[in-house]
């Protein structure tokens, strides 16, 4: 996992509340066995509508997704995060997230930022008015800056540490590689070994 320090660029003003993981990535896409290539399935059913915000040329290349309350609710499929990330989003801003989706984002290097509903509304309106506007999510300073918005956000210290250092669950374990190897060398030969 790559470290996340700052996500800066155009934003996609989705704004919908209660977007579930089936809407983020349809179940048809779950037949894939790789973790890559899910971006093309992001909001697939909604993208059939030519007026859907993600289809608009002015929003191409957005790196920050701005959503409504309870983003990522529904099933626990990690594929939803893979689709968001594979499409190019490094951060998602919303008033609230489903817990499992938020946790999956952390484990995959996508920064989730919870801001008050009114702040998210102002940011959505500003980006809808000026699609070229830059939104900056700075994890080091815990700030979000955009047109008419400059605010701080809270994030768990350990989650912040993981993201800043690019540590997924495997990366956290590998920080103890020497201890693991020492333990394996000290185990009796008749015990199962990890290769």
Swiss-Prot record:
GO cellular component: 3-isopropylmalate dehydratase complex
Keyword Heme annotated: no
EC number: 4.2.1.33
UniProt entry tagged with the keyword Protein biosynthesis: no
Enzyme class, spelled out: lyase
One Pfam family linked to the record: Aconitase_C
GO biological process: L-leucine biosynthetic process
Domain of life: Bacteria
Key words, A-Z: Amino-acid biosynthesis, Branched-chain amino acid biosynthesis, Leucine biosynthesis, Lyase
Pathway field: Amino-acid biosynthesis; L-leucine biosynthesis; L-leucine from 3-methyl-2-oxobutanoate: step 2/4
Single GO MF annotation: 3-isopropylmalate dehydratase activity
Family: Belongs to the LeuD family. LeuD type 1 subfamily.
Subunit structure: Heterodimer of LeuC and LeuD.
Function: Catalyzes the isomerization between 2-isopropylmalate and 3-isopropylmalate, via the formation of 2-isopropylmaleate.
Protein name per the record: 3-isopropylmalate dehydratase small subunit
Naturally occurring in which organism (per UniProt): Rubrobacter xylanophilus (strain DSM 9941 / JCM 11954 / NBRC 16129 / PRD-1)
